[in-house]
Amino acid sequence: MSDTDPTTATDDTLRTPIVAVLGHVDHGKTSLLDKIRGSAVTAGESGAITQHIGATAVPLDVISEIAGDLVDPTDFDLPGLLFIDTPGHHSFSTLRSRGGALADIAILVVDVNDGFQPQTLEAIDILKRTQTPFIVAANKIDTVPGWNPNEGQPVQQTMDAQSDRVQSDLNEKLYEIIGELSDNGFSADMYWRVQNFQANIGVVPVSAETSEGIPDLLTVMMGLSQRYMKEEMEIDTSGPGVGTVLEVKDTQGFGTTLDAIIYDGTIRNDDTIVVGGLQGPIITDVRALLRPRPLEEIRTEQEFEQVDEVAAADGVKIAAPELGDAMAGAPIRVIRDRDRSEVIAEVEEELAEIEVTTQEEGVVIKADTLGSLEALSSTLEEEEIPVMRAEVGAVAPRDVRVAETAGESTNQAILAFSVDVLDDARDLAEQEDVKLFEDDVIYQLVESYDDHVTAIEEAQQEQILENITRPAKFRILQDHTFRQSDPAVVGVEILSGELRRNVNVVRWENGEANRVGTLKTIQDEGEDVDSARAGERMAVSIQGPTVGRQVEEGDDLWVEIPEKHAKILEQELKEDISVDEREALSMYLEKHRNRDPFWGK
């Protein structure tokens, strides 16, 4: 932070806790952040709230002002809260540091009307995996029919002011959310009933629209941070800075820049830094540290102003050469008075910690950040979907070339999470029949791919079934011989299975299957058909036998199934054939196995 920054902590050994806001799209994350920011600007003196890159700092005195009687500032040593403004809804998974989450604590925003949605579950998975403590903001309480808003009031106060019916409706919605948390393995209750926040999740009813409950939200966040995280907040602000890249972007006049959160030490504008890149660590010199100009100066031509240094915890835009390969979610470390090779090794080690297991055969995955790549990879591993290549960045033609080398057609696919697909890559994928799946929600991305795999497998099964001789038993009907031989044309009833054309036919005698001929055609009322099912009566032509010699009216005949086909039907395709085909197969196998117990095994 610059010397003049009003949010500088008085106790420079305690940094501001970093807060991430997560939740399903449209559940009110952005509105909640905007309202916290807006309330802070209103409550603070002019200039008390500084604009930050990728973050909003709310100092303790401003929290105290918003929370009123709920907070006694003398109870707290921590300087305030730093809310990360994650780009897009999904980027919490970006925010990793030293193998865990960058955020010290999180707010999971859930719409009281909608409850848990796919991205809520996705957020919960990430919170579990990174072991990040969180509270639930049950948003949109003002939308309960009959709600009487009380702008900016603590939630218990405003709930007490509602009618019994409204209170009852709201409580029902809140307990549904508590139930859903329980289904996902978390014990939860209204925050004012929670005794131990380490064992239970506190639910804070809020309205981003009317600010009701926001005093409680800030109070609970401060209380949790102070009580459970004070030791973790102790840092040496004079030491070399450590941080995480939020976004890599082009900034006019500065070229490629990094939006970053510094969570330990200090970064200065003449420091040499090591940043995680696509091809490994990037070593570069800081040319400028940039902050947005204060709101009252926004009309000036330059959007940013330069500062000499930034101390943890804070957001900053870093301008430096050779940042083209830097990755969102990657570590940043200042070298300063440390051994260069040691710092490079630490960054390499941190990059290696990103748990993405690849195999020789599998799909290609692309994601916008290292953290999302890790989250997607972890989900695919749970679903037992193999990954051949995993990278950060847009889908390029070379990704298509890799995907098309997959041996299995189900693996000739690219799963793209929140990234662009270059036009020439899209054209090439179409040309080479590589399937592209794009989504901003991991669950939906994986679901689309699963549907694709199911469709391929079903088509393959159908193809196999087409080439397999299907089981059937049929009877020659009495008084239904239309032609005795060459070919014999008779009326039949299918007793079980499915009778098809161009199959060999056997009659069982003394435990032996004797081939009597080949069934050539099936007719239904003079029309040729491909098949007939159990219960149907048809006219069939059989090349080979003469009725009255090799076959008789009233005989039961069977389709001759090659032993190899019988084995495939029993062991691989049993679930894909109908119940009466299974019955016909079972009887056919039994007849053979009476003679040879290992037939078709």
Curated annotation (Swiss-Prot):
Task: Cite the residue spans of the region called G5.
Answer: 207-209
Residue ranges constituting the tr-type G domain according to the UniProt record? 14-229
User: What is an example of a GO molecular function annotated in this UniProt entry?
Assistant: translation initiation factor activity
Q: Which UniProt keywords apply?
A: GTP-binding, Initiation factor, Nucleotide-binding, Protein biosynthesis
Q: Which GO terms describe its cellular component?
A: cytoplasm
Region spans: G3: 85-88
InterPro entries referenced in this protein's UniProt entry, alphabetically: EFTU-type, P-loop_NTPase, Small_GTP-bd, T_Tr_GTP-bd_dom, TF_aIF-2_arc, TIF_IF2, TIF_IF2_dom3, TIF_IF2_dom3_sf
Disulfide bond annotation, renumbered to this chain: none
Report residue spans for region: G2.
Answer: 48-52
> PROSITE patterns, alphabetically?
G_TR_2
Q: Which CDD domains match?
A: aeIF5B_II (cd03703), IF2_aeIF5B_IV (cd16266), IF2_eIF5B (cd01887)
**Annotated region G1: where?**
23-30
Q: Outline the segment boundaries, as ranges, of region: G4.
A: 139-142
Please tell me where GTP binds in this chain.
23-30, 85-89, 139-142
* Highest taxon in the source lineage: Archaea
HAMAP family according to UniProt: IF_2_A (MF_00100_A)
Concerning its family, UniProt says: Belongs to the TRAFAC class translation factor GTPase superfamily. Classic translation factor GTPase family. IF-2 subfamily.
As for what it does, the entry says: Function in general translation initiation by promoting the binding of the formylmethionine-tRNA to ribosomes. Seems to function along with eIF-2.
By its UniProt entry, which PANTHER family does this protein fall under?
Answer: EUKARYOTIC TRANSLATION INITIATION FACTOR 5B, TRANSLATION INITIATION FACTOR IF-2-RELATED
State the NCBIfam families in the record. aIF-2, PRK04004.1, small_GTP
Quote the protein name from its UniProt record. Answer: Probable translation initiation factor IF-2
Lineage of origin = Archaea, Methanobacteriati, Methanobacteriota, Stenosarchaea group, Halobacteria
